[in-house]
């Protein structure tokens, strides 16, 4: 027979579990094989890469091409993209099966989260030397910047638009926390956006 203290202990454990943060929809740091295959199958059902819902922040590019923002390229969205590519050309995917499996595993094993920023500037090299950070609970995490994409000319507004990606090792940030994402162009003011990582898959 359990005593009063054991009963209280069980109740307290139940309360603690009830208030644990829900991480099922947080950014995936590690995927088991079932989750990996599920993401690929979801992509196959979507079929068209353009319809893959990559988590996004900032401006809607269809309405404001120079509004600033970007994509949070999670493992799940990357695997869905590969699934869509497989569905688009299944014969080729079957012929190149070893390479396809390698690409899937490489995406699942990625050690860094990539965030790709899109923004505009007045010169072809406007995206060079940009920096990016994540801020969580007062802590700043600096990203490792990649080489920017070649700038494209605009028909109106700033003369050029382009992309640059920043990589953040998974162990350096909390994948379930509200996050402030900031881009620091070499010319002009910094741009910041709020994103709740607990709601991103």
Predicted feature locations:
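Conserved functional micro-motifs across diverse proteins
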Residues: 25-179, 184-201
